């Protein structure tokens, strides 16, 4: 049974601007593990990675039903990749659910869609 669906799109320019203005922007959005990956990337890929993770976490928060705020933070959500490179989400505040995520980006935008499926108990 579908618990929630979330979609987010963000401009790469906007993320680059925020990262340039706010010194700790990436640290606020990315978990420690995600930051390790981020620091290994070229400058161009860093912005795509950060924008994609931002969009995925926003989409997850919408599917979760709370948005980012008091009940759910960017740090509660981690995007990982399986052995084939397919992204998946780990969230400490969610159990008994399967989470499906798709992340994409173009030259100008990053977008993500998340579906949370409640598993029968």
UniProtKB/Swiss-Prot annotation:
Tell me which UniProt keywords the record has, alphabetically: Cytoplasm, Fatty acid biosynthesis, Fatty acid metabolism, Lipid biosynthesis, Lipid metabolism, Magnesium, Metal-binding, Transferase
What is one process in the GO biological process aspect for this record? fatty acid biosynthetic process
Swapping residue 2 to A leads to an effect described as: 6% of wild-type activity
Enzyme class at the top of the EC tree: transferase
Question: InterPro entries given for it?
Answer: 4-PPantetheinyl_Trfase_dom, 4-PPantetheinyl_Trfase_dom_sf, ACPS, P-Pant_transferase_sf, Ppantetheine-prot_Trfase_dom
The record's SUPFAM superfamilies line, in alphabetical order, gives:
4'-phosphopantetheinyl transferase (SSF56214)
Under Enzyme Commission nomenclature, its number is 2.7.8.7
Q: Which HAMAP family match?
A: AcpS
Protein's name according to its UniProt entry: Holo-[acyl-carrier-protein] synthase
Q: Which organism is it from?
A: Bacillus subtilis (strain 168)
């Amino acid at each position: 049974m579908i618990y929630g669906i979330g979609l987010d799109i963000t401009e790469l320019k906007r993320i680059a601007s925020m990262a340039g203005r706010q010194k700790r922007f990436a640290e606020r959005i990315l978990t420690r593990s995600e930051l390790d990956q981020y620091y290994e990337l070229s400058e161009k890929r860093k912005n795509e990675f950060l924008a994609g993770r931002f969009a995925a976490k926003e989409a997850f928060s919408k599917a979760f039903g709370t948005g980012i705020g008091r009940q759910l933070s960017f740090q509660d959500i981690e995007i990982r990749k399986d052995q084939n490179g397919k992204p998946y989400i780990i969230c400490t505040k969610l159990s008994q659910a399967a989470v499906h995520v798709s992340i994409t980006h173009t030259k100008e935008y990053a977008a993500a869609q998340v579906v949370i499926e409640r598993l029968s108990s």
